[in-house]
Each structure stands twice: as C-alpha cells, then as structure tokens.
C-alpha cells in the first residue's frame, strides 16, 4: 500500500533511536530514503563538509506553530544546504568548494536564520544538531557508520556504485556527480 504521509525527520530519527539493533536502524533509514534525507545526513556526518556559519548558538525565534501547519519541511529545505556549506574536494589538488559563491557571509547567516524560523521547532533543532555535529548524541545509533551502510556510501560518503563504475579512481573521490560528468565532457 502506498503511504501518503511523509514523516518529519525527527520522527524518522526517533524510530532509528528506538530500533533495537543496527540492522533495524539501517532498515528505518532505507524505508524513508529520499534526496532530502540523504542531503541532511550528508551534511550532518560527512567530515569533509564544513558549515560556513559562526560557531555556537544561533539567534533565531523558534516557530511555535503546530507541526504540519504554517512552516516549511526539512525534506525540502535540506536541498538548500549548499548555501551554508563548503566541501573539501580531493583530486590532483585538495581544495574547498563553496556550495554557493554568490552570497556573502551576512546574507548566508540571514538565510540560515530565516530557514530555522520557517521550520517547526523540532526540525530547526535537528539542523542545529547537524551544524554542531551532535546529532548522534540526541539519537542513539544514528551515526556516520549507520548512515553509510543504509545508503551504500563508502568511507568518503560517495555512493559505492559510483566508485565501482568509475573504477575507484582516487581523483573522483569526494567529487559530486555533476563534477564528474563535467570532467567527462572535457575529455
């Protein structure tokens, strides 16, 4: 039967927390697999991704509207995280790739605060845990190893099928699929 209700991320992570062992935790993540969830967990656990925001508390007003009303969902907002991060790209020269170079730090911080205020309070809290790298402290068993196993990612958080397809060439590790496609076009 097709399920029309899409649980919020904190509901999914509570299911992971309550699962008795790692295979069940992995099964919960696989059951709810979606691009937004993958993006969120990537920025939460990949050590090669750094948040381009000040350390510490964020001055925002939590949204007190009931869940499911008057706010955006993290499922959708997770696809905008490129505005707030930079990623270490491995290849012939290791360098940081900024997700969105078109915005300055003040605008980036304002956009982040606006995103938090538009989310429900529990989902905004999840984003802060991801930013502070403390998600695994709130949800037992939700860690880098579990996430990598659930989504078939290698130790560099790259899809193992993509690595196998590319022959495991070191220059491709850490690159985004669109970067690989662009380099293939160039020859």
Task: List the predicted regions and their residue ranges.
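N-terminal nucleic-acid-engaging modules of covalent nucleotidyltransferase systems
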Residues: 1-187
């Amino acid at each position: 039967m097709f399920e029309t209700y899409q649980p919020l991320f904190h509901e999914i992570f509570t299911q992971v927390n309550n699962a008795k062992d790692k295979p069940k935790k992995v099964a919960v993540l696989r059951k709810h697999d979606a691009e937004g969830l993958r993006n969120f967990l990537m920025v939460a656990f990949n050590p090669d991704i750094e948040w381009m925001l000040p350390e510490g508390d964020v001055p925002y007003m939590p949204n007190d509207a009931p869940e499911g009303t008057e706010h955006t969902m993290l499922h959708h907002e997770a696809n905008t995280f490129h505005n707030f991060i930079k990623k270490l790209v491995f290849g012939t020269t290791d360098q940081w790739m900024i997700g969105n170079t078109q915005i300055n730090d003040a605008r980036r911080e304002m956009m982040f605060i606006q995103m938090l205020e538009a989310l429900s309070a529990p989902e905004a809290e999840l984003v802060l845990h991801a930013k502070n790298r403390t998600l695994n402290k709130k949800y037992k068993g939700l860690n880098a190893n579990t996430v990598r196993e659930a989504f078939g990612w290698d130790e560099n958080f790259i899809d193992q099928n993509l690595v196998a397809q590319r022959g495991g060439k070191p220059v491709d590790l850490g690159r985004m699929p669109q970067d690989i496609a662009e380099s293939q076009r160039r020859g």
